[in-house]
């Protein structure tokens, strides 16, 4: 099994941008944590982060072509991107995806409570900090067994 972990806009700024909301853990820290957990689970994992919608869509298409499940933190595209949802629909029809948010998006500004992706996701993890990525990985690994 192989899982693609996708991080959307501004997540390259983890540890620097709004640490009171997102904490001090960097994206490199998150990727290392997930890679360690994936290794322990016997799961292959790869990562992409982009601030550009088209690059994320291309990554989703690549995952679909390989039959990989996806863990995605779409950042601000959660609330705005029909195109990303359309790409993820192919994953939803196949291996499936889990939507992850570091902060509790439902406890923040009202516009953050709406997700174009949640209705087609296997599940949504929000507000559990960076641990949400590991929980998503564990869920996907358990699902394969």
UniProtKB/Swiss-Prot annotation:
Q: Which UniProt keywords are listed? A: Amino-acid biosynthesis, Aromatic amino acid biosynthesis, Lyase
Pathway(s) it belongs to: Metabolic intermediate biosynthesis; chorismate biosynthesis; chorismate from D-erythrose 4-phosphate and phosphoenolpyruvate: step 3/7
Q: Say which domain of life the source belongs to.
A: Bacteria
Q: Which residues bind substrate?
A: 73, 79, 86, 102-103, 112
Site (Transition state stabilizer): which residue positions? 17
Q: Where is the active site?
A: 22, 101
- Quote the protein name from its UniProt record: 3-dehydroquinate dehydratase 2
Q: Which organism is it from?
A: Corynebacterium efficiens (strain DSM 44549 / YS-314 / AJ 12310 / JCM 11189 / NBRC 100395)
The encoding gene: aroQ2
């Amino acid at each position: 099994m192989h899982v693609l972990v996708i991080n959307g806009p501004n997540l390259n700024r983890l540890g620097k941008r709004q640490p009171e909301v997102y904490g001090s853990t960097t994206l490199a820290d998150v990727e290392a944590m997930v890679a360690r957990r994936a290794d322990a689970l016997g799961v292959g994992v790869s990562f992409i982060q982009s601030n550009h919608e088209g690059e994320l869509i291309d990554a989703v298409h690549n995952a679909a072509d390989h039959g990989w499940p996806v863990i995605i933190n779409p950042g601000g595209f959660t609330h705005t991107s029909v195109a990303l949802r359309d790409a993820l629909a192919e994953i939803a029809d196949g291996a499936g995806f889990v939507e992850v948010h570091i902060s509790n998006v439902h406890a923040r500004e009202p516009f953050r409570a709406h997700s174009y992706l949640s209705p087609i996701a296997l599940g949504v993890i929000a507000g559990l900090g960076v641990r949400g990525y590991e929980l998503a990985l564990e869920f996907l690994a358990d699902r394969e067994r």
